Swiss-Prot record:
This is Placenta growth factor. Keywords: Angiogenesis, Developmental protein, Differentiation, Disulfide bond, Glycoprotein, Growth factor, Mitogen, Secreted, Signal. One of its GO terms (cellular component) is extracellular space. The keyword Protein transport does not apply. InterPro entries: Cystine-knot_cytokine (IPR029034), PD_growth_factor_CS (IPR023581), PDGF/VEGF_dom (IPR000072), PDGF/VEGF_growth_factor (IPR050507). It comes from Mus musculus. The gene is Pgf. Antiparallel homodimer; disulfide-linked. Also found as heterodimer with VEGFA/VEGF. Residues 1-18 form the signal peptide. Gene3D superfamilies: Cystine-knot cytokines. GO terms for biological process: angiogenesis; branching involved in ureteric bud morphogenesis; cell differentiation; gene expression; glycogen metabolic process; placenta development; positive regulation of cell division; positive regulation of cell population proliferation.
Length: 158
C-alpha cells in the first residue's frame, strides 16, 4: 500500500513537471508579438572581432605543467567570429600584452606565492584569406608555432 502511494506521488510530481515545462515552452508562443533580432544586430554580434574567451594558463605556458595555478584559466580577448566568406578567416592584426597576478602552487605544495604572468590579447581582428599550405610547409613550421610570451607582437598568430 505504501509503495502504491509513493508511486502515485511520483507520477503526480512527474505530471506537474511536464505541465510546467510545457507551459514554459508555450508561453512565448501565446504572445502576439514575437521578438526578432534584427539582421544588423545578428551580423554585428557574429562578425570577426575580439571576444572574451577563457584560456587555460597551461595552454599558454606549457613548460609550467609541474605547477598548479589559481585560477587555472584567465579571461583574454581573442579574435573570433564569422567572415561571411568560406575563403576568409578571422585573424588578429594587432595584439597587446596584459600582465596578471596569478597564484602559483609548487608541485610539492610548499608555500604558494603570487606571480605576474603576461598573456597576449588580440586588440584588432580582420578577415583575411585562408592560406593553403602544403604538407611539406606544415612540417617545416611544426614546433615553431608558439611565440614568446614576453614580447609584444603585431604579427597575427595562427
Amino acid at each position: 500500500m505504501l509503495v502504491m502511494k509513493l508511486f502515485t506521488c511520483f507520477l503526480q510530481v512527474l505530471a506537474g513537471l511536464a505541465v510546467h515545462s510545457q507551459g514554459a515552452l508555450s508561453a512565448g508562443n501565446n504572445s502576439t508579438e514575437v521578438e526578432v533580432v534584427p539582421f544588423n544586430e545578428v551580423w554585428g554580434r557574429s562578425y570577426c572581432r575580439p571576444m572574451e574567451k577563457l584560456v587555460y594558463i597551461l595552454d599558454e605556458y606549457p613548460d609550467e605543467v609541474s605547477h598548479i595555478f589559481s585560477p587555472s584559466c584567465v579571461l583574454l580577448s581573442r579574435c573570433s567570429g564569422c567572415c561571411g566568406d568560406e575563403g576568409l578567416h578571422c585573424v588578429p592584426i594587432k595584439t597587446a600584452n596584459i600582465t596578471m597576478q596569478i597564484l602559483k602552487i609548487p608541485p610539492n605544495r610548499d608555500p604558494h606565492f603570487y606571480v605576474e604572468m603576461t598573456f597576449s590579447q588580440d586588440v584588432l581582428c580582420e578577415c583575411r584569406p585562408i592560406l593553403e599550405t602544403t604538407k611539406a610547409e606544415r612540417r617545416k613550421t611544426k614546433g615553431k608555432r608558439k611565440r614568446s610570451r614576453n614580447s609584444q607582437t603585431e604579427e597575427p598568430h595562427p
